[in-house]
Amino acid sequence: SDEELEEALTSLVQKIQEEDRDVEQINRRHREHDHSITLPKHFKNHVIDSAVAFIVDNYSQSVGLQEAANHLGVSESHLSRLFKEVTGLNFLQYLNAYRINKSVEAMSDPKKNIAEIATSCGFPTPGYYAKIFKRFFGRTPTQFRDILGSPQ
């Protein structure tokens, strides 16, 4: 009957509206969530703590394992092995994750474009930055920024 059909349609419309609300809540939570990769900064290991401090101080420069090892007065192979052992990440993974976190912070300034953010965070090219960013967040920096609601 028409009444039954109308009831079924009304019920369906309500379900769709509820789902829309759920999606909106998830999106809002996602937007409000702290978009950063959790990176401990203290490891109770002098060499690794010093290496992390080196990253924090120099992430915006063109630096890597070699520069960190030279700065700390240890061999690259020793630092590489120890870093992986203590942090669970290799040096470059940690450095890139730190740079990505800094880039996400920089995105909140709508005056900065993605290329500027990439170079200011120590990435050699915007393309490399986008590739690494996508590996962490599953989307490009531009797509990510659009979700955050900042103008490109």
What residues fall within each predicted segment?
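Helix-turn-helix
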Residues: 68-76, 80
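Key DNA-contact positions within bacterial/archaeal DNA-binding proteins
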Residues: 77, 126-127
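Hydrophobic, helix-rich cores of sensory/ligand-binding and other regulatory modules
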Residues: 1-32
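Amphipathic alpha-helical repeat elements characteristic of tetratricopeptide repeat
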Residues: 6, 42-49, 97-98
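Generic recognition of well-ordered alpha-helical segments
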Residues: 8-15, 72, 120-121, 132
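Basic, amphipathic alpha-helical hairpins
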Residues: 1, 15-21, 36, 40-43, ...
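Terminal helix-turn-helix DNA-binding modules in bacterial transcription factors
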Residues: 52-57, 62-66, 74, 85-124, ...
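…primarily DNA-binding HTH/wHTH and HhH modules…
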Residues: 38, 127, 131-152
